[in-house]
């Protein structure tokens, strides 16, 4: 397995993320810890074990063991779930929405980063560090999670659920699996080449989709949810790595979070002020664009009513559902409801990272560019809720290079820099290089001759009759049109003669940079079909963890 850095690739075009990776002094006021320094992990560990974390370890560990068992996780994950009940154990956390076919590959790379960094820090700190994947089961952005791209030869194909999700506000963990999942699996199977691994991968896709609910049978009518399918697939993909899965909609975890919800309801003013201070620092002091939309009077909480996840607002003693003033409570009534029925509440983007630190002794969080920016707004929110922000580590970036793609690169003597940044220009250069007849030059020379000879002819005609100027000009335009048409026909034939090479360039683009980076477009599952269900475990074990950040190509 050969690994090579890809030059010129950024985690994000955001100036804030670029500064986070390479100009720490500029962003330091917004975060608690410098992710590049081992001292940060040591200080964070000392903070957590010295009283900074006071969560119910036994209850969290029991809930996670039960949930992972329901997902079919292996003994390595179950043992790690139990380890979280021990007082010295720390957590390494990442997370993502529950996408179909495990979503874009960067979800996989977030987990890979977390597992490998957890192993490193466990060795360096001398304590167990358990990798945890936070499945955002409470999320209701169905449009974002209902589709994914897969490579298909020289093209990319979009696979999507056929249901319409306009206005859908049920959480992905609490709604029955969409019926079109079966058709989507069939379509995926048809697109995949026949390999020795295909039958096993497709069979597991189907089995994971029809298993019983992993969380609340009542909420989904006894059917599995999209989050269940995602969790079972992820547990299968990461078997042997010790990755523990957490579903944010787990009623057992909600019960542990009840005091957190009550505090958020009681300290709305403090949280609002802290969030405003973070936004002000981010925009005015640091000069970055804010990535969180602030809603006046927001409690940064949702409430579930008739299965729908609805945002809460509050002012004074009154709390109500945004856009539904008929659904209102006194603040004390809602605090009481949160303590009695915490499963009816969930956090928004502002409090989600904070509740993570309430539940888990999180040494660090591995995030993508958007999350890095979110965390930069929340240092004071953590403090307002009696917590402290963990070390925030950027996820690793990868592109998988298959053997046929590597052969095309080698055949055309292309570097990764060429393939990622100059492919269109090099494609045109190939056409020009293979043009042994000099098509472009021949037509350019002919045009020059034509312009000169036509001008001479026009002068003669206009001497005969100056009123023929319009006819002369129309004649010139018609002849130019025919010349252009003939040139295009010649170029088309030339491209046809170069078709094999051009198809290879198209294949490079479709596989390496499909509408952007591969990791943001493709699911990992097509690569499991081709290279085996244990591919991700092999990547976890064999790809070295780098200091700093770079985007790397992995030659399979």
Curated annotation (Swiss-Prot):
Keywords: Coiled coil, Ligase. GO terms for molecular function: ligase activity. It holds the Pfam family Rossmann-like_BshC. Its EC number is 6.-.-.-. Signal peptide: none annotated. Residues 408-442, 468-513 form a coiled coil. Belongs to the BshC family. Involved in bacillithiol (BSH) biosynthesis. May catalyze the last step of the pathway, the addition of cysteine to glucosamine malate (GlcN-Mal) to generate BSH. This is Putative cysteine ligase BshC. The gene is bshC.
